[in-house]
Structure formats: structure tokens, C-alpha cells
Amino acid sequence: MPIMGSSVYITVELAIAVLAILGNVLVCWAVWLNSNLQNVTNYFVVSLAAADIAVGVLAIPFAITISTGFCAACHGCLFIACFVLVLTQSSIFSLLAIAIDRYIAIRIPLRYNGLVTGTRAKGIIAICWVLSFAIGLTPMLGWNNCGQPKEGKNHSQGCGEGQVACLFEDVVPMNYMVYFNFFACVLVPLLLMLGVYLRIFLAARRQLKQMESQPLPGERARSTLQKEVHAAKSLAIIVGLFALCWLPLHIINCFTFFCPDCSHAPLWLMYLAIVLSHTNSVVNPFIYAYRIREFRQTFRKIIRSHVLRQQEPFKAAGTSARVLAAHGSDGEQVSLRLNGHPPGVWANGSAPHPERRPNGYALGLVSGGSAQESQGNTGLPDVELLSHELKGVCPEPPGLDDPLAQDGAGVS
């Protein structure tokens, strides 16, 4: 590869690596910080983000290294060449798990919480990663070209005894890449996801038509279903972008394998396809920010607080706080639940005591909608609520607003 072309390739790859790391760390940070985003679907989103972070930290540096054709032991070269296949497979499994999760949520919503639990999701994620390593590192178990070293190329690179010129196609057999990796482990899951999302949209369309035919359709049920469909569209876009980024490289591999007499793809085209495949690790955070309001708002808060160092004023509304009114015989009790703080506990470990106001209102932190009473009133600063602000308050019960951002979150 010419020095100029090599420099451009390395520069672009490094830029992609930085963006992939920063964007996907932001995704994981948002889920960790915002309790509204801590749901089963987003466990799989975090697994997908972890694979994309690993692409930026490891796979892209490995790809840059292997592009130089440096001399190495064959199995060491194999590990470097195959590691990106592990991460690709993990991404595919995460996308498939998300598609199935959304299918269950729309097809059998009443059984969703019983079937799809956090413990099961974490177990599925662990299994997906184990399978990804097994599939991606299969060439190291013997399905490789280490037994047929290309002596001429090795000598031209100045490689010593027992070393090979570390180039992807020289160590990884193309029949593995086409038959096993592409046809079995990439194309089949992509087709399954296509079928699952098609069924999701058909089922949602049928349910919406049934609601329209009812004399008094439930607006809340209709709104929830529409938001499920919106989330499914967002995730289907992510699957489509994955296919768009990875299929060109696999198509080039198919031409190389099925037409050995044809001229090999130009080197610039190969590197363009490789860069496109790595770009997939950058795009997902932008999709979340553009399509999902709760992610977008949390990204803004993280950037303002931790990057720009701007202090945001306290707001007792929106996604960071919720006011719940409980009506009693001796007045009204207003409780404030804050995201990011343990409900009903001060920072020093003591529980708050709701203070009785002269106007008959009490203020306290709640857990699950009930006030927590205890001795002591130190810790978080008091919050003043005026009685006229509470007149006519009639909050909706907490419920699903978006499957990717539950408990009060929303989508745009």
C-alpha cells in the first residue's frame, strides 16, 4: 500500500476508533446514570455498546497493525485477525436479542415482565459472548492457512523461520469467511431479524386497527403501542445500518472465493469496505440521540455537567424528578422522587422526616409511591413548594412511556 494511502487509512481508522469509544462510553454512562434507561432492552444495548467500544480499543488497532503485513507467528497473527470477528458476532447476537425482546413486548405484552427478566437477560448476554468467542476464534482451532504458508511472500517481508507475513487473507481461509462466518453466522441472523421486525410491524398495525374499530379505544394503550412501534423502528434502523456497513466487505469476500480467476478487488476498495465496517461502531449513539428522547436528554446532561462543567438548576419536573400527590383526610401529602438518589435515604445514610407545612402539605422522598418517615432531617437541602402550585395537580400513574426508556421516559 502506498505511504500516502496508508497514512490516510490509519488517520481515518484512528478517528473512527476515538468516536466509537467516546460515543459508546456515553451510551453506557447514560444507562448507568439514568434509572429510566435501566431496563432489559437496554441491557442488550449496553452489550452492543461494549462490543463497539472494544472495536475502537482493540479491533481497529489490530486492523491497522495487520495492514502492515508485519512478521509474526501464525497463531498470533490469527488471533489479531479473528478478534474483530468475535466483536462482529457479539453485535449480531445483541441485535437479534433486541429484536426478539421487542417482538415479545408487542405480541404478548401482558406476559413480557414474567418472561423477560433482568436475570435472564444477563444470562443470555453471557451466552452470546461465549458463543461469539467460539465462532470468531474457530480458525485458531485448525481451520486456517498456517499449514500452507506462502514462502515467497514471507521471504519478501523478511520473515524468519516459523513466522508469516501477517495479512488477513493469508492466514484466515476464505471458505471459513464465506460459508461459516458470512452465510451461517451473519446472513442467517440478519434474515431472522428482518422476519422478526416485519412481524412486529404487522402485529402492531393489526392491533392499532382493532383499537380504531373499538367504540371507546383506550388512549393510554394506543399511546403505549405507538411508542413500542417507534422504538422498534429505531432498532430496525440500527439493524439496517449494521447490514449496510458490513455487507460490502462480505460481498467482496464472496467474489474473491467464488471467482478465483477474476481480478482481485483493488486495495483501495478493500480498505474502504473495512473502514465502512468499522464505522458501524460509531453510528448507534447518534441513532439513540436522534430517535430516543430519554437518551438525548441524558447525553445533554452528561455533556453539560461533566464536559462543559455547567451546573444545572434543580427542577422538580421532567425526567429527573416526578411529583406524586397522595390525597388524605387531613390534607394532601406531596412526595418528590429524584432519579440518581436512593429513595427515602439521605446522603449520610439517615432517612428523611417529612416536614409538615402550615398549609397542610408534607414533603418527603418516596419509594414505590409511599412516604418514608424516620428521625432526622439532615442531608439533601429542603425543597420549597407553594400551596398554589399544588392546586389541581392530578398526575398520571407511572407507566411505560417507551420500552427503551421506561418509567416516565419518552421518545421523539
UniProtKB/Swiss-Prot annotation:
Record membrane topology: Multi-pass membrane protein
InterPro entries: Adeno_A2A_rcpt, Adenosn_rcpt, GPCR_Rhodpsn, GPCR_Rhodpsn_7TM
GO CC annotations, alphabetized: asymmetric synapse; axolemma; dendrite; glutamatergic synapse; intermediate filament; membrane; neuronal cell body; plasma membrane
Spans through the membrane: 8-32, 43-66, 78-100, 121-143, 174-198, 235-258, 267-290
GO biological process: adenylate cyclase-activating G protein-coupled receptor signaling pathway; adenylate cyclase-modulating G protein-coupled receptor signaling pathway; apoptotic process; apoptotic signaling pathway; astrocyte activation; blood circulation; blood coagulation; cell-cell signaling
Post-translational modification: Ubiquitinated. Deubiquitinated by USP4; leading to stabilization and expression at the cell surface.
Record GO terms (molecular function): alpha-actinin binding; calmodulin binding; enzyme binding; G protein-coupled adenosine receptor activity; identical protein binding; lipid binding; protein-containing complex binding; type 5 metabotropic glutamate receptor binding
Amino acids binding adenosine: 169, 253, 277-278
Keywords, sorted A to Z: Cell membrane, Disulfide bond, G-protein coupled receptor, Glycoprotein, Membrane, Receptor, Transducer, Transmembrane, Transmembrane helix, Ubl conjugation
PROSITE patterns: G_PROTEIN_RECEP_F1_1, G_PROTEIN_RECEP_F1_2
Keyword set includes Cell wall biogenesis/degradation: no
A Pfam family hit: 7tm_1
Cytoplasmic side: 33-42, 101-120, 199-234, 291-412
Sugar-modified residues: 154
Ranges for region Disordered: 391-412
SMART domains from the UniProt entry: 7TM_GPCR_Srsx
Annotated SUPFAM superfamilies: Family A G protein-coupled receptor-like (SSF81321)
Extracellular side: 1-7, 67-77, 144-173, 259-266
Principal cellular location given in the protein's record: membrane
Cystine bridges: 71-159, 74-146, 77-166, 259-262
Function noted in UniProt: Receptor for adenosine. The activity of this receptor is mediated by G proteins which activate adenylyl cyclase.
PANTHER family: ADENOSINE RECEPTOR A2A, OLFACTORY RECEPTOR AND ADENOSINE RECEPTOR
Subunit annotation: Interacts (via cytoplasmic C-terminal domain) with USP4; the interaction is direct. May interact with DRD4. Interacts with NECAB2. Interacts (via cytoplasmic C-terminal domain) with GAS2L2; interaction enhances receptor-mediated adenylyl cyclase activity.
The name this protein goes by in its record: Adenosine receptor A2a
Organism field: Homo sapiens (Human)
Upper lineage: Eukaryota, Metazoa, Chordata, Craniata, Vertebrata
Gene name per UniProt: ADORA2A
